[in-house]
Amino acid sequence: MKSERFSLDANILFYAVDRASGQKHAIATRIAARSLDADCILTLQALTEFFAAITRKKKMSASEAAHLVRNWMSIYPVVPPTEGTLNAALQLVTTGRASIWDATLIACLQANDCHYLLSEDMRTGSRLGEVEIVNPFMGSLPRALEHLLSDDE
C-alpha cells in the first residue's frame, strides 16, 4: 500500500539523532529510515528548528548539524514558506487555530499536498486544514503510515 505524503517535524528529526532519547530514538530512527522510501517531505522550518535545538542542547556542533541538514536537503524534497503559505498561516492564526509557527508549518505542508505531520509537539489526531497531526510515540499510526513502524521490511 502506497502511503500518503507526510512530513517529519523537527522533534522527530531530533530524536532520530539523539541516542540518549531511549525509546523515542528507536522509534524516530525507524521512521527516518523508512521515510527514505516513502513520500516524505521536509519543511525549511523543521530543518532550521532542528538545527537550533540540536546545537542549543549541545548534542552536535554547528558544523556537524549543518552537515546533517545539508544531507537531508539532498535526500528529501524541502518545501519553503511562500507569500501564499504566509497568508494561509495568518488565516489559521486569526481564527485561533494555531500559533504563527505551527500555522506556517501546516500551511507549507498543505500547499504541497501533505496529509500528515509526524510530531510530538501538537495534539495528535487534530487536523489543521488537510493536515492531520500524528504523534508516533503515542501508539498506532494511521493506516496510510503503518509501514513506518511495522516489523515488515
Predicted regions and their residues:
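Amphipathic alpha-helical interaction segments
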Residues: 45, 49, 67, 88, ...
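Active-site-proximal, substrate-binding regions of enzyme catalytic domains
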Residues: 49-77
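Acidic, metal-binding active-site segment of PIN/NYN-like and related structure-specific nucleases
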Residues: 103-145
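Acidic catalytic patch
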Residues: 44-48, 74-95
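Short, well-structured N-terminal submotif of metal-dependent ribonuclease cores
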Residues: 1-42, 57-64, 140-146, 150-153
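Conserved glycosyltransferase catalytic-site signature
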Residues: 10, 102-103
